[in-house]
Amino acid sequence: MLDLKKFLATPNDFEVLVKCLKKRDINRQHLIFIQKKWETSRQLKKKIEQLRKTRNQLEGPQNAEKVRVVKSEIATLEKELNGLNQELDNLVKELPNLPAPDTPFENRIVAKTEYTPLFQPQLTHEKILRKLVLIDEEKSILLSGSKFIVYQDLGSQLLHTLINFMRSENSRRGYRLFDLPYLVNDYNLYHTGQLPKFKEDSYQLNNHNFYLIPTAEVSLVNLYQKQILSEKDLPLNLCAYSPCFRAEAGAAGQENKGLIRLHQFHKVELVKIVEPENSYSELEKLVQDARNLLHLLKISHRVVELGEKELGFSATKTFDIEVWLPVSQRWLEISSCSNCEDFQSRRAQIRVKKREGDKYLPHTLNGSALAIDRLILTLCEYYYNQKENRLEIPEVLKKYFF
């Protein structure tokens, strides 16, 4: 959530807000509408305070009728103010985070690493998945419909091997491991920015206030909601595996087949809660932690800094990591690493207490390390031995393979 007081206090501050949110397709007139609501709210508060002072100055039975009139006026204005503040709160909830000042207009490649596949690639991952019977798409449809997947035999082994590999490597790099609920209350999704804007993309239980998580980021950030943390405990580095659930329609055609775009998918997520002055150096570390896994697996990849209009709702800066599929001849996003600054901590009421006693909002960061279903199809194009019709297990995974 944005701090409106910071941006509506002066005309210059308001122009900064207009300029930044124009990059996120929020028009000036909408912000002027919000500004007028905020100013009306501010004036109502002043009027109520003045009436309270007047009431306190009226003493004695001779002023009883005047006190009654003032109390009635205060009650009327307070009701008006509460309704206005609720309307204002709903409007502010819809505003996305501001892009970092150095965010590019369009996506730009900032790093790239190339590796040679173990075997000369010939078959696409779709053909390899079916040839090795790693998944059963027909049974997936029988169970749940399209965009769900059944892993079986080697496919199931590979899924859990990658989960254990990623958890182990991330733990080795200083992340605390968590296993968390996959159902959360609606306010948890609000804290991280999925609600109210992306309600239609979420799975909600009928007649309940529970939602299936779209990412473990939701659960990890909300472990610290409404808490005051000690500055000496920062940075917090958190890691969790979870299945993720998203109802979004996605792209049409080939994207809806196989493992690329699913309603239920698997991901290991990293979250950092850090001091504001360190958040961008921590973002660099987060990107390196995600890339570390791809280096170990010897998979070609690149890092793309997202342009202004590509940023997620809560993010102020994002780097996507894309893997190269040598047979499919395409780049595929496998991780997205974002700095949300204090957008989520303000919503979740996460604060940090300094040694001298002052409190501040920490910055939150999140990133996938990595998207597992997409990594499985990537491994197919790098490690499939067509001559012997088998998938070679990368050396770094063998100690996790069972």
Q: Model segments located where?
A:
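N-terminal alpha-helical targeting/anchoring segments
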Residues: 1-116
